[in-house]
Amino acid sequence: DGGEPAAPLWFGPRV
């Protein structure tokens, strides 16, 4: 994305 905080790895980080 680019608007949400990066989630944990097991969630799939948004970068």
Swiss-Prot record:
Which positions make up the signal peptide? none
| Key words, A-Z | Amidation, Neuropeptide, Secreted
As for what it does, the entry says: Myoactive.
Q: Which subcellular locations apply to this protein?
A: Secreted
Q: Which GO terms describe its cellular component?
A: extracellular region
GO BP annotations of the record are:
neuropeptide signaling pathway
Similarity remark: Belongs to the pyrokinin family.
The main place the protein resides is: secreted
Q: Which residues carry this modification: Valine amide?
A: 15
Q: Where in the body, by tissue, does this protein show up? A: Found in the abdominal ganglia and perisympathetic organs. Not detected in the thoracic ganglia, subesophageal ganglion, corpora cardiaca, corpora allata, hypocerebral ganglion or frontal ganglion.
| Protein name (database record) | Pyrokinin
